Amino acid sequence: MQSTLPSLFIVGPMGAGKTTVGKLLAKHLGRDFIDSDHYICEQTGADIPWIFEKEGETGFREREARAIAELTALPNVVLATGGGVVMQPQNRDNLTKQGITIYLRANVDVQLKRTAKDKSRPLLNTPNPRAVLQSLFDVRDPLYREVADIVVETGDGYPRYMLKKIIEALKQHYPEHMKS
């Protein structure tokens, strides 16, 4: 598909499918795909749990803010962000000013199902991950909505179904940029 859209940024909670759907969207549009968490790991030579352990969440968020400033300035990319990206005002500013932001909205039940076996999520290494996910959702959902140009309810949908919903929304909201 041909498009003259600016860069596309995907936000949402952990387990929403940002990376999976982002890769599909990038392929569909013929664009490069970048995952900000993977980018941070490549830049530091360490994984996210290690960064959290050594630098704490504050250290990670500082690294994330630098990465988001750099990555949102790139042209014609699809960028999947980390779940906490919206916690920093400068990240929200970069997301809203540099491209089109798509919020993949997943409820806590969906997130819990998709993250249950994933041990690489430091914020879920707790006896009650449901409570953590609910707390994060309550704080972050309004911030995701604040930056979002498009909101896609993921439900229990498959990645290709979510891709279809995103493409339909892009055609509806930005028809001048979308050509079949």
From Swiss-Prot:
HAMAP family: Shikimate_kinase (MF_00109)
Amino acids binding Mg(2+): 19
Keyword terms: Amino-acid biosynthesis, Aromatic amino acid biosynthesis, ATP-binding, Cytoplasm, Kinase, Magnesium, Metal-binding, Nucleotide-binding, Transferase
Gene Ontology terms: cellular component: cytosol
Cofactor(s) in the UniProt record: Mg(2+)
Function: Catalyzes the specific phosphorylation of the 3-hydroxyl group of shikimic acid using ATP as a cosubstrate.
Domain of life: Bacteria
Family, as annotated: Belongs to the shikimate kinase family.
The protein's assembly and partners: Monomer.
The keyword Nucleotide-binding is assigned to this record: yes
Binding site for substrate: 37, 61, 83, 140
Protein name, as recorded: Shikimate kinase
The EC number(s) this enzyme carries: 2.7.1.71
MF (Gene Ontology): ATP binding; magnesium ion binding; shikimate kinase activity
Stored InterPro entries: P-loop_NTPase (IPR027417), Shikimate/glucono_kinase (IPR031322), Shikimate_kinase/TSH1 (IPR000623), Shikimate_kinase_CS (IPR023000)
Family matches, as SUPFAM superfamilies: P-loop containing nucleoside triphosphate hydrolases
Residues reported to bind ATP: 15-20, 121
Pathway: Metabolic intermediate biosynthesis; chorismate biosynthesis; chorismate from D-erythrose 4-phosphate and phosphoenolpyruvate: step 5/7
Keyword Kinase annotated: yes
Reaction equations catalysed: shikimate + ATP = 3-phosphoshikimate + ADP + H(+)
